[in-house]
């Protein structure tokens, strides 16, 4: 953070990790700089609302979690301490089905456009947000040798609100077509555009629904517990590939104790379910613990 510099006040942030699906070594997660109302770099998409997601120790988070980082340029302005609007141009990264022999992928070149409007109260600890995204995704029909572009769109209503001094409530509802790359479980596959089994050479953007709700209770000054419930629904047309994702369900409950501002210990139980379009399904139950030291 810099204050009273020749270019004004600014903030810079960088974050990385050594975990992730199928990855080894260091992974850069965020790297951005903010000056006045402008942000540039690798940052959370304007379409998301990380503050409205219940806290989990599970690194992957809920199955329908909308928590994607994009390279972007964003303008965000707040006035009267209650109203916020923002818009951003974000580097596209569509994830399109590449298994169809009748189509081929096109390079992304039209940016994603994201925007939000928000009302906040309780000194910024509570808010309601409506956000949206518009995407362009292209492919080539090999049966006619023609390029096609499909419009993707998404909308999310989210909120976080303090209910008294010890309880915080969270909630999100998201709907869209061609936004699978933004959503939890679906982001690990190529679900933004799928092959239409009834029309060779045609790809379409399937409808997706997701939602989450949760509550955090500050049991003691140093002990907090958080509950998270979530679901993700993927609604492709008739006759999708057998292993195509259909829906997922998620539950987690945790407790975190702060020994000091730098040292935390947490324990968590989580349960999840996934079902594919062919009826195959799997369930998981897991207990985990986390020891965190900050410096």
What does each of the following model-derived ranges do?
Residues 1-95, 109-110, 114, 118-125, ...:
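Outer membrane beta-barrel
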Residues 115, 120-240, 244-245:
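Detector for outer-membrane/organellar transmembrane beta-barrel domains
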Residues 251-268:
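C-terminal closing repeat unit and adjoining cap/tail of repeat-based domains
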Residues 257-259, 283-295:
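Outer-membrane beta-barrel "beta-signal"
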Residues 11-15, 30, 86-88, 129-133, ...:
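Outer-envelope exported proteins of Gram-negative bacteria
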